Amino acid sequence: MKQDFYEVTENEQIAPSVFKMTLAGDTSPITAPGQFVNIKIPEFYLRRPISICDWNDKSLTIIYKAVGDGTRAFGRIKKGEKLDLLISLGNGYDTSLSGDKPLLIGGGVGVPPLFGLCKKLIAENKTVNVILGFNTKSEIFLEDESYKVICTIVSKQNSL
């Protein structure tokens, strides 16, 4: 675990009430997909835990749904602002247990941590299939990014 300030380089809405935020800073403590961060919001006492969607040497990406006062406040954060984060929380996924042809299943805001997991499994030369579920067509996110790296089946509860 590491506490530090990270600069917001992107915070954009990607689906109804769903936002993608990229934060620049030291990501070296992140060791596995599936880990999360705890973010301090200036006007709130408690930090908000958000799973890490993806990361590289210089930044990390989170995807969050604005459902309460805290996550709605995230939506008002502007590019260039600095946020206090605790990073590299949780154990993450142990890919040694996945076998050669893992099937990943997730829905809604459970989808983001699967993106980093899928990238790691592919880097390990595993054949990955993913099933993503969403309530409506308008709520689908990461579809374009997912198709670049994986075979994906996207389902939704309502009809097209």
Listing of model-derived features with the role each one plays in the protein:
Residues D69-L160:
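FNR/FR-type flavoprotein reductase catalytic core
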Residues K2-E81:
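Ferredoxin-reductase
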